[in-house]
Structures are given as structure tokens and as C-alpha cells.
Curated annotation (Swiss-Prot):
Mg(2+) binds at residues 11, 106. This is DNA polymerase IV. NCBIfam families: PRK02406.1. InterPro entries: DNA/RNA_pol_sf, DNA_pol_Y-fam_lit_finger_sf, DNA_pol_Y-fam_little_finger, DNA_polymerase-Y, DNApol_IV, IMS_HHH_1, Rev_trsase/Diguanyl_cyclase, UmuC. Residues 7-188 form the UmuC domain. The gene is dinB. It holds the Pfam family IMS. Its EC number is 2.7.7.7. It comes from Francisella tularensis subsp. holarctica (strain OSU18). GO terms for cellular component: cytosol. It is found in: Cytoplasm. Monomer. Its cofactor is Mg(2+). Binds 2 magnesium ions per subunit.
Length: 349
């Protein structure tokens, strides 16, 4: 019989903005956002919940955010501050278990299956972690507790902010049936639209499709979809998690018709990329890459061997790549390649 696992996913609430709020309490009752300080070309990194009440969201162009909330306060990103807070939080995770898989500065998976303290209750452990984070940093985070990573991550988003949601093994079937398929790991806009064209919008809909059909339509990922629709996820929490790459991309509502327009997007993409990187990622960089998709959906990318994340090199790659394209740009992606791998295999996207 397979041993039931106890997985916790911790996701800090509006992390960058919350850190800024803690540093400057006068912001607490005001709508504010981090990043996107250029009102014409900027993009919001994150915002507090007061700003969200006005409709402001992460990745929203600053111009639109200011239309929705004219009195929105814009702050520059301060990654040194965010990384310092993240280091304290991560130390707390390791106090409770060695099985920690960081995903970014503000979220991680923890496997507490073998933790004997707190009556071996994942719920009590999650409560203790949240309390310890608050005691040491003054920050709140939300936790999801479930038998696997898939469900724990989904659960952590349910009662935000400062939430805790538990999915017990007996609740898995009822929990997943009404879940939108877009909540499933690996389902992006393309997969979501493809599933929708097949009449699939919820996990219950997805359960009606055979394994053979899903593999035929989605290849290897079809097998994962088949399991995810049933709340099954066998991925382990990997405490020595080795990522082959970290990348970000953005699709723009208005086509980028000039090199200058493309270069103006680099700062926000760079901030977004660095926010997803841990200290371990920085130590194992072997290359950087830039990708374009034009208005005719042609994809082009360039890579360079590099040991550091160099914004100037990214800028030069954008310039070089732009010279190869004859059409306006719809999407820009940037990223780093990690680990020891042949340069010819540097395809992040």
C-alpha cells in the first residue's frame, strides 16, 4: 500500500507589496503597487489588496492600472529587501523539515509526511509555520495542505490572504470535480483553449475523456492530465530541486513595432525573472536566452553562454534578434539556462 503523503504549499501574500508595507506602515491603508513606475510603459509587478479592489492586477500595464485607480502609489522594486525577507522565511521552513522545495522568493512546497511533532498533523504544522513567519517577519502567507503537490498549491490560493485550506484524502474526489482545468499544473492558455474546444472546462469534464484520447491529443502531457483530473499527482517534493531553466514571457496587447518599444519591456521582464530566481539559480547559470514571437506567430530565439544574469547582454540579444525580424513583435521571453548542458541544447522555451 502506498504511503499517503502530507504536503504543504506556502505562498506569501502579495509578497513584494507586503514587504514594502511592513517597511513603510503609512502605505497600509492606501492603494499601491510595486514596479511599473514608468506610467506610460511600465508593468505592475504586484499590488496590495486595496489596489486590487479597484481592479489593479499583477502584470497589468501601469497606464491601465492608473485609469482604474488614479490615486495609485507606485514604488520601485527593491529585490535586496525581498531576498532578505525570503531568506528568513526559508530558514523557518527548514526548521520544520529538510524536505523543502523552493519555487521562488515567496513560495515553496514542504513534505511533512515524516514530521513527528505537532501530532504528525500537517494542518497543525502549517498553522505553526504561518505563525512563526508572522512572528519573525510580520508578514502573512497562505497555506494549502493536501496529499500531493497539485492539490496543495491549488488549496493555498483558496482563502487568501492569510488563509489555510486543507484537502484530506477523503475529500479529493469531491474537491477536484468542480475545479476549472486552468487550475491544473501545466495547463496554460493554449491547453485551456484546446480543452475548451473539446467541451472540457472542469475536471469532471476531463474525467470523461479516456487516457488514449488525451495522449493522442496532448502527447505525454495527456497522461498527466488524466491523473490530475482525478487529483492524482506523484511528483515528489524535491529538496535538491534542479531546474534546467527559469524563464518569463509576456504577450502584449499592442504590437511592438520598433526596437525601442521592445527594449522598454526589458526592465519589467527582468524584474519578473529575478523574482522567480533563488540563490541556487544564480550560482548555476550557464546561459541566457531571448525569444520573440511575431504577429504571424513565428518564433525566434537567441542564446549566449553566460555565468551571470547580465541585463546588458539581454539588451544586446534583443537588439540582435530584432534585426532578424521583419514583423511587429507580439511576445517577448527572457530566461536563464541552469546546470551543465551543451550550448546547442539551450532551448528554454
Amino acid at each position: 500500500m502506498t504511503k499517503l503523503r502530507k504536503i504543504i504549499h506556502i505562498d506569501m501574500d502579495y509578497f513584494f507589496a507586503q514587504v514594502e508595507e511592513k517597511a513603510n506602515p503609512s502605505l497600509k491603508d492606501k492603494p499601491f503597487a510595486v514596479g511599473g513606475t514608468n506610467p506610460k510603459r511600465g508593468v505592475i509587478s504586484t499590488c496590495n489588496y486595496i489596489a486590487r479592489e479597484y481592479g489593479v492586477r499583477s502584470a497589468m500595464p501601469t497606464a491601465i492600472a492608473m485609469q482604474k485607480c488614479p490615486n495609485l502609489i507606485l514604488l520601485n522594486t527593491d529585490f535586496a529587501k525581498y531576498k532578505a525577507a525570503s531568506a528568513v522565511i526559508r530558514d523557518i521552513f527548514y526548521y520544520f523539515t529538510d524536505k523543502v522545495e523552493p519555487l521562488s522568493l515567496d513560495e515553496a512546497y514542504l513534505d511533512v509526511t515524516d514530521v513527528k511533532e505537532y501530532k504528525n498533523s500537517a494542518t497543525l504544522i502549517a498553522q505553526a509555520i504561518k505563525q512563526e513567519i508572522f512572528n519573525k517577519t510580520g508578514l502573512t502567507g497562505s497555506a494549502g495542505v493536501a496529499p500531493n503537490k497539485l492539490l496543495a498549491k491549488i488549496a493555498s490560493d483558496i482563502n487568501k490572504p492569510n488563509g489555510l485550506y486543507v484537502v484530506t484524502p477523503k475529500q479529493v474526489d469531491s474537491f477536484v470535480k468542480d475545479l476549472p482545468v486552468k487550475k491544473l499544473f501545466g495547463v496554460g492558455k493554449v491547453s485551456q483553449e484546446k480543452l475548451k474546444s473539446m467541451g472540457v472546462e472542469t475536471c469532471l469534464d476531463l474525467q470523461q475523456l479516456s487516457l488514449a484520447t488525451l495522449v493522442d491529443k496532448f502527447g505525454k502531457f495527456g497522461s498527466s492530465l488524466y491523473n490530475y483530473a482525478r487529483g492524482i499527482d506523484n511528483r515528489e517534493v524535491n529538496p535538491v530541486r534542479i531546474r534546467k531553466s527559469v524563464s518569463v514571457e509576456n504577450t502584449y496587447l499592442e504590437d511592438l513595432k520598433t526596437l525601442g518599444a521592445c527594449l522598454e519591456k526589458l526592465p519589467s521582464l527582468y524584474d519578473k525573472l529575478t523574482s522567480r530566481m533563488t540563490e541556487e539559480h544564480y550560482k548555476s547559470i550557464i546561459g541566457i536566452v531571448v525569444k520573440f514571437t511575431d504577429t504571424k506567430f513565428n518564433k525566434t530565439s537567441l542564446t549566449r553562454v553566460a555565468k551571470i544574469l547580465d541585463k546588458e547582454m539581454l539588451k544586446n540579444l534583443i537588439i540582435e534578434l530584432h534585426q532578424k525580424r521583419n514583423h511587429p513583435i507580439r511576445l517577448i521571453g527572457i530566461g536563464v539556462k541552469l546546470g551543465e548542458i551543451d550550448d546547442k541544447q539551450m532551448d528554454l522555451f
